[in-house]
């Protein structure tokens, strides 16, 4: 069949023209109603319909009868238009935290330039400028996401749960979790540490005579509050800090009797002999971190989102394969000693994939704070989790495919992303 009179192109021609993967084209056909024509086993794309669909923001195309009447026909982008597009520079700001060990993958991505590398591979004709925004806590980055000053952010489980609630209060802010980062099981990764002279071994031994330090509005402060609530320790003085390094300094200098610390400061305190870990059942849940973006931004910058997740997965792979090389990068970026970094890296599960166990952890965390109930049956059940970006990133790296649903049951080590 001659294609030219009908303005048809093959599916592969459309893929080459748009510069996307086959998985993206298939998803657009399914979810965004990309216009196509199936003749026998072959899939064809009408050039005019495709152009109208792209110009319409990837929504429904103009009805076929209007196209046939010639009422709204636009030519495909010319060489001049493509040249103009390369002159437009798109700025992307990534928020990261050097003082949170479970989020150290971002330091590797930044140091190695892997995000920029993946962007060049995905869209060689586009110009991007990547900026990096350092923060001392995840809630700072959530505020930056809401303001539109940060597009991709690495945050802990409390900011993840809090952002879901903020999304309900602020209709224009629809947070999407793109992938997990570091994970720690069963209360590891974040704990209460008391000075040895305090003689405190259990949470119920806390008294009002000594203050406790932690980072305000954080995964650490939420867990500390749970310990205090369980033991009815309303009289205990809590000193809120903006930086976890300040909490460790207060503990070392004797200005507080205890501090709720996350890694690497937990291991650092133990290495320096600053105190003893306090046993507290309230800290027994998993400690999780992840990558977030605004859903509308991610949807309109799909190739950028997938590019970052590819770099993110590569950082995880480097940590697992060559922890010394990863630790050296982190030392240079954070100033934390190598002897602290290495054991911390080994204690963390570096896995971007989503398990039902993880969704249950976040659901419980949200219920504790605000009555938030995250749906855990399907990643596509609500705006909180978007599986397609991580799926495409894994496929591009030739890793085993990820399901649309959360991986059931417990963590396994046979597939790590």
Model-derived features: positions:
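Acidic, polar ligand-binding/catalytic clefts
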Residues: 152-200, 249, 412, 416
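Periplasmic-binding protein-like
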Residues: 174-194, 270-298, 309-312, 383-393, ...
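Bilobed "Venus flytrap"/periplasmic-binding protein-like clamshell domains
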Residues: 91-118, 191-258, 263-268, 360-363
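Short helices/loops that flank or line small-molecule/ion binding pockets
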Residues: 136-153, 166, 241-260
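Pocket-lining segment of extracytoplasmic ligand-binding domains
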Residues: 159, 243-333
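A ligand-binding cleft/hinge motif common to bilobed small-molecule-binding domains
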Residues: 154-170, 255-275, 360-371
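N-terminal hydrophobic or amphipathic helices and topogenic motifs
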Residues: 1-142, 146-147, 356-417
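Secondary-structure end/capping motifs
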Residues: 302-381
């Amino acid at each position: 069949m001659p294609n030219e009179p009908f303005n048809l192109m093959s599916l592969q021609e459309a893929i080459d023209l748009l510069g996307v993967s086959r998985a993206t084209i298939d998803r657009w056909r399914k979810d965004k109603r990309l216009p196509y024509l199936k003749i026998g086993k072959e899939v064809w794309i009408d050039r005019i319909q495709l152009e109208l669909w792209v110009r319409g923001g990837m929504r429904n195309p103009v009805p076929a009868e209007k196209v046939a009447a010639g009422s709204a026909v636009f030519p495909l982008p010319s060489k001049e238009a493509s040249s103009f597009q390369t002159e437009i520079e798109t700025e992307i700001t990534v928020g990261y935290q050097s003082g949170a060990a479970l989020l150290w993958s971002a330091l590797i991505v930044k140091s190695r330039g892997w995000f920029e590398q993946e962007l060049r591979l995905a869209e060689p004709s586009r110009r991007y400028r990547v900026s990096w925004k350092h923060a001392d806590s995840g809630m700072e980055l959530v505020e930056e996401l809401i303001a539109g000053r940060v597009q991709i952010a690495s945050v802990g489980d409390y900011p993840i749960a809090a952002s879901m609630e903020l999304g309900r209060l602020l209709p224009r802010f629809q947070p999407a979790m793109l992938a997990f980062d570091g994970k720690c099981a069963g209360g590891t990764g974040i704990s209460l540490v008391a000075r040895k002279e305090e003689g405190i071994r259990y949470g119920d031994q806390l008294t009002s005579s000594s203050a406790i330090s932690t980072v305000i509005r954080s995964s650490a402060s939420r867990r500390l509050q749970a310990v205090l609530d369980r033991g009815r320790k309303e009289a205990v003085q809590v000193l809120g800090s903006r930086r976890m390094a300040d909490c460790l300094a207060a503990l070392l200098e004797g200005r507080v009797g205890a501090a709720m610390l996350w890694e690497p400061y937990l291991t650092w305190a133990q290495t320096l002999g600053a105190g003893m870990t306090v046993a507290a059942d309230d800290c027994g849940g998993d400690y999780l971190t992840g990558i977030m973006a605004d859903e509308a931004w991610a949807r309109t910058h799909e190739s950028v989102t997938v590019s970052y997740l590819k770099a993110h997965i590569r950082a995880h792979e480097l940590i697992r394969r060559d922890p010394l090389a990863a630790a050296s990068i982190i030392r240079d970026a954070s100033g934390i000693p190598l002897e602290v970094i290495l054991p911390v890296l080994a204690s963390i599960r570096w896995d971007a994939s989503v398990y039902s166990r993880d969704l249950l952890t976040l659901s419980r965390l949200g219920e504790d704070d605000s009555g938030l109930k995250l749906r855990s049956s399907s990643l596509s059940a609500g705006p909180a989790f978007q599986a397609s970006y991580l799926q495409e990133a894994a496929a591009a790296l030739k890793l085993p495919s990820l399901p649309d649903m959360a991986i059931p049951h417990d963590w396994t080590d046979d597939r790590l992303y």
